From Swiss-Prot:
Keyword terms of this UniProt record: Amino-acid biosynthesis, Histidine biosynthesis, Hydrolase, Methionine biosynthesis, Multifunctional enzyme, NADP, One-carbon metabolism, Oxidoreductase, Purine biosynthesis
Organism: Sphingopyxis alaskensis (strain DSM 13593 / LMG 18877 / RB2256) (Sphingomonas alaskensis)
Protein name: Bifunctional protein FolD
Molecular function, one GO term: methylenetetrahydrofolate dehydrogenase (NADP+) activity
EC numbers for this chain: 1.5.1.5, 3.5.4.9
Binding residues annotated for NADP(+), in chain numbering: 171-173, 196, 237
Gene designation: folD
Family matches, as InterPro entries: Aminoacid_DH-like_N_sf (IPR046346), NAD(P)-bd_dom_sf (IPR036291), THF_DH/CycHdrlase (IPR000672), THF_DH/CycHdrlase_cat_dom (IPR020630), THF_DH/CycHdrlase_CS (IPR020867), THF_DH/CycHdrlase_NAD-bd_dom (IPR020631)
Biological function: Catalyzes the oxidation of 5,10-methylenetetrahydrofolate to 5,10-methenyltetrahydrofolate and then the hydrolysis of 5,10-methenyltetrahydrofolate to 10-formyltetrahydrofolate.
CDD domains: NAD_bind_m-THF_DH_Cyclohyd
Family, per entry: Belongs to the tetrahydrofolate dehydrogenase/cyclohydrolase family.
Length: 302
């Protein structure tokens, strides 16, 4: 007996990410054979934020499952700027570490920008250092932020060549919006960058073949904003207030999913769309960084 037929309009980020992680795991033995070691990812957690601790744990498990070495470093919430940066410099010098991820946000007394800038750009698997941002803007090979890169992979899997597509990115954060715009430009899209001050946003969205929503407002993008046949990538993750009698509210994206599903050619759900791609692309970046640091060609297919 077979289960229900999946809705072809729903982009299954979970399944795509699982396939990507499997391909990464398949590529690790060749690197190990060439270098005598596994690619290594170090994650730094400052403080005891519960959500950050969960993220760090899931990243560690995924790293080990891919056959890579996982290094976890925890500092107290009272850690000083000097202590954080000293640990990052220590990891920069550690030959067993190919990728460094500083879990954000940091406690409020710390300077996130200065800490991130301490990371060796060749180990910057989150793609957040000023050097990584500059390389992306100039089209020079480097590390690309994981979430927007995951979005690009989902789009290319669905559409193939993106050349000539009209794309709109709603949101201008350094984590998603800005690098997403650069990646779409690099893929030969015509890109509109929108944000909270953009005038007549619905009209701009209605022109777009590709909509990437990363603004952090629950269900802000309405179904009647979407052009029929568009591809919608919803990066948002927002928890609504609990309904009567419920312990907690449901998770929704930045797009009114139910309404958009009836108009779009395809859309990512929340959860289960973009989220799983982030960790998969973190592993991909670690694999690529390891090859480049070892003087090897980028692994085929990545």
């Amino acid at each position: 007996m077979t289960g229900p037929v999946p809705d072809a309009r729903v982009i299954d980020g979970k399944a795509f990410a699982a396939g990507l992680r499997a391909r990464i795991a398949d590529a690790v033995p060749a690197f190990r054979a060439a270098t005598g070691r596994a690619p290594g990812l170090a994650v730094v957690l400052v403080g005891d934020d519960p959500a950050s601790a969960v993220y760090v744990g899931s990243k560690g498990k995924a790293t080990v499952a891919a056959g890579m070495a996982s290094f976890e470093h925890r500092l107290a919430a009272t850690a000083t700027q000097d202590e954080v940066e000293a640990l990052l410099r220590q990891l920069n010098a550690d030959e067993a570490v190919d990728g460094i991820l500083l879990q954000l946000p940091l406690p409020g007394h710390l300077d996130e920008q200065a800490a991130v800038a301490t990371i060796d750009p060749d180990k910057d698997v989150d793609g957040l250092t000023p050097v990584s941002a500059g390389r992306l803007a100039l089209g020079i090979p480097g590390m690309v932020p994981c979430t927007p890169y995951g979005c690009l992979l989902l789009l290319q899997d669905r559409l193939g060549d993106l050349s000539g597509k009209d794309a709109i990115v709603i949101g201008r954060s350094i984590l998603v919006g800005k690098p997403m715009g650069q990646l779409l430009l690099g893929a030969n899209c015509t890109v509109t960058m929108a944000h909270s001050r953009t005038k007549d946003l619905p009209a701009l969205v209605r022109r777009a073949d590709i909509v990437v929503a990363a603004v952090g407002r629950a269900e802000m993008v309405k179904g009647d904003w979407i052009k029929p046949g568009a591809i919608v990538i919803d990066v948002g993750i927002n928890r609504l207030p609990p309904a009567d009698g419920a312990a907690k509210g449901r998770l929704v994206g930045d797009v009114d999913y139910a309404a958009a599903l009836g108009v779009a050619d395809a859309i990512t759900p929340v959860p289960g769309g973009v989220g799983p791609m982030t960790i998969a692309c973190l592993l991909r970046n670690t694999l690529v960084a390891a090859h480049r640091r070892a003087g090897l060609a980028d692994p085929e297919g990545f």
